[in-house]
Amino acid sequence: MSPWLRQLVRQEGGLSNKAGSRVAQHSSSADEVCAFVRIHGDAEAVLQRYGSKALAHKGNIYIAAIPVSQLYSLSNNENVSRIEARPYGQALLDSAARAVNLLPAHEGRALPQAFTGKGVVVGVMDIGFDLTHPTFYSRDLSSYRIKALWDMLSRDTLNSSFPVGRDYTTEDELLTLAHSYDGLNQTHGTHTAGIAAGSGYDSPYRGVAPESDICLVANAVSNNVPDIEPEKLHKFTFATDALGFKYMFDYAEQQGKPCVISFSEGSGQDFKGYDVLYYEMLDSLMGPGRIIVSAAGNQSYMKTWFHKPIGEQGRGTFLKYPSSLHQFTLKSAEPFNLRMVVYGESQTDTLLLSTDFVLAQPDSIYTDTLSVNNQLLVVQVEAYPSCYITNEICFDVNYLPIGLSEPYPYLSAEILGIDADVEFWRGNCQLLTNVLNPSLNAGENTHNILSPSSSPRIICVGATCYRDSVLNVSGQWRKTDTYPHGQRISMSSVGPTMDGRIKPDVMAPGGNVISAYSSYYLEHHSDAYDITWDVAHFPFRDRTYAWNSNTGTSMACPVVAGAIALWLQAKPDLTPEEALDVIRHTSKPYDTSLSYPNNEYGYGELDVYAGLLYLLGIDQIKDVSKQHTSAKVSVRGRQLHISLPAVNSPVSLRLYSLSGVQVMSQQIPVGHSDYSISLAALAQGVYAVQISGDAKVQGSTLIRVNE
């Protein structure tokens, strides 16, 4: 069993609980847990024997509802090789840094007219959906584009076949529901879904795939735990999230459409193997026309990792003295010593531990205490092999204060041993410096990609920024950190992963992105801080809605998901590997002095249009520019309409088929700002339009000619 499940069994009385465990404590009254199980042989018979129910499976990996009282017995069955689960993650949003206008690509102005996501399902698993926001209708309000929602938190579960919550699959059901169960207090999903797939209604804040179908899953994260009945918390795990991914892919399969999923949530990686079966299950769900995009995380604003190499006697850091259970992890293939010191007003207390001593203890767990100023710090060290390289041993250092009172002590941790190569991973502690020992200043803002973005096959997205301020609805300028255009925002998580792979894969604008905000959240939290970042309020069908500016990799992720929806429209059987190949060949480097891919920028910043040209083979037509034209080009009926800014020289227009054959050529004289051309002679299909001449409009776009 994975560690969280073992802790759950201890709480139920099946095992003795050990002091200082880093696992979060929950109510022990849950009747079952949703978990991954690897079963060899007759899986249905094994699960039935222990009162468990299979919810889904791929190969020999099952997602099952398991009675907590049967976990220990099931884990000892000879046909069961692993049971894995851990609780919910968190929404990846920085609530203190928001602002500004979207790039033209986000507004839909720089996207080719031929590709809008039509015929593609965009899935979003998130929290806080306003199902009534007009951005989820078509631009002209003639069609409602949310097609299904599985609300995992719903308490309307009579006759529901779902392990938690229920789903809503008709327009009447969805609009009557109006918002997800957590929708009065959360709005994150409204914003991310709007970025990926919003029509923009009557605003410039159009999503990247504004004509796609939308399928939603409202799941559980730390943010919306208050909306969950305490006795049901154990039902919400990564296994439940995996069922959510499957739900969206299954919906798309029923409709005969490709699907890309945007997931702007995550949790820390680990060396215990919490995600082994999770990643295998996600890998099995993906394939041709089935792609998952996930946010890298917002962890790089702080120190998260450091390395003590062989040949260096020691390296260390101060840690913020905890008010609750805190943890960090050390990893090495060689023995070393750990020194922790607590500093009081006039005294110190030191704990010096050798890793060999910890490994010699029962269950490789050792507990001790540090004490100053009548305050006690309980320290527990647990050793186990890395799930990636088994000859490397990991040490989880958990520490918990007892009798906390001011003034708080100071705390330091040092890694000692000249012959040991050791890595430090933050866990949930905070690395600091202190004049008490200025040499203890280790720490880098790296190695902090979250899961499941760290999964090899999932496309991991980091965030860049272009503007630093926005005029809010009250006429006040709201300002965030200033970055050069295209630079990674400081909090956007950085690789490598715990097993050494480069992540993120790609960057997209995630700083100061404007998208939809929930009318129900606005109604119930009108004085909330984030409402001061609303850039507009507007009426729609007797409610007041908002457009809001937000920052985080949560916002960058749906930009990439929306882009892949356009690519799926061009190539419905696009695989995750092919999508990454498009990213590899067409992304834009921020700093050309760097080699790519790298752990800050991946392959660079997404280029939606260049990706389409690459997929369609148009990038091989030498006379077609890879730069999108600034002219407004559209097709209405069988007429091509071009709107030009004031130009100083004649403009030529050429049309090419996807095979590279020039099918039309026209000259537009100086002084003509609007021009129309008949397309009656052309067969239906996609064509490249190349506009040349004046530098203001030099570039290309794609059009679609219908019957």
Model-derived features: positions:
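Autoinhibitory N-terminal propeptides
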Residues: M1-Q113, V121, N223
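Short acidic, glycine-rich surface-loop motifs adjacent to enzyme active sites
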Residues: A218-N219, F245-G273, A295-A296, E414-A420, ...
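N-terminal domain-start motif of subtilase-like serine proteases
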Residues: Q7-S27, Q70, A91-S142, D172-T187, ...
